[in-house]
Amino acid sequence: MKDHYTLRGVILDPNASKKIFTSPQRNTGWVVDMFQVWPYNMDANLYTAGKLWKGDVAQASFQNSDAWHSQAIAWSTFSGATAEAVGVNIIDPDHVITTELHVVNMSAQACSYIVHLRRVHLDDDQEIMSLLKERQQDV
């Protein structure tokens, strides 16, 4: 099994989500090292925003950053409206993906994304704690 994955693609629908990764085995977790979004059509769109969401995406909001929600683990924006393009990329350093990962497009247009995942080994206790946190339960 690989120790890292690079996932990249496009979400064509505005305010939509896409499952981009499913963890293949028990006692294996995945950590996001890098996440960035940018407009799918750089000529027509000057702004885009996205976030990474682990586990069930049904609770994900497409309109805000959800920094309070433990399933939201990374946020990225891109704006080309100024002379120099600017972006903000934030990754929660205390997260482990144990089931699945979704990218959420919070923009009114299509967005491109790239994510780098690194594999980590989990003992049984760590896996249970990660699953509880992923399901938004108190730990």
Show which residues each predicted segment covers:
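Beta-strand-centric surfaces of beta-sandwich/beta-rich domains
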Residues: M1-V31, Q36-V139
